[in-house]
Amino acid sequence: ANDFITNDSQVVVNGSLTAQLGNNEKAQISLDGGTTWIDLTVTGTTWRYTDGRTLTDGTYQYQVRVIDNAGNVGATDSQDVVIDLTKPAAATITVDSVSQDTGLSDSDFITSDNQISLKGTLGAALGSGDHAQISLDGGATWTDVSVSGLSWTYVDGRTLADGDYNYQLRVIDDAGNISATTSQVVTIDTVAPDASKTIAIDSISD
């Protein structure tokens, strides 16, 4: 990813050159602050380096350069990569209610309101780089929900047709570590019972 934060302990670094190397030039990478340099495999104007180490949590700097056989250094660059293998502290996330739950129970997630909001609870406060997120499309895309302390809220801006809608929730950090997931189906039913079906009180038993 472009943020250079990952939960993968084995890193592959990809890069590019603005022009192809000359016959007496090479691209190199250093993992130790420039003390030693390793020749990169270059194809055209792109290069790729597989770091053979198994990295633990921390920040690792990769330096690259272009150098010729005479030792003249041209272009240089450096990039810090953050390894984060630790999941967020919030081990649970729950969906507690839907606005205007008009079903027979006020907690059955059935409503006649076609514009809804959800609210729920986190098992622990989010840390820096942690996010509570919701997906409306089966996990294809995710949106951060609003969080205050241990409570979260989400307003669904759609006007929903009658049917069932599955809301997925998760807690995730910038590195992609997921600590909690849940899902909740909400039923939208705006259709009143058939008006041709009547109910009447006919008599009492003496």
Spans of model-derived segments:
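Surface-exposed, short loops/turns at beta-strand junctions within beta-sandwich domains
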Residues: 51-59, 156-164
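Short, solvent-exposed loop/linker segments at the N-terminal edge
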Residues: 1-9, 100-114, 205-206
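Short beta-strand segments within Ig-like beta-sandwich modules, predominantly Fibronectin type-III
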Residues: 38-44, 143-149
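Aromatic/hydrophobic beta-strand junction motif of beta-rich domains
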Residues: 13-19, 118-124
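Flexible, low-complexity linkers/stalks enriched in Thr/Pro that connect modular domains
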Residues: 75-101, 180-206
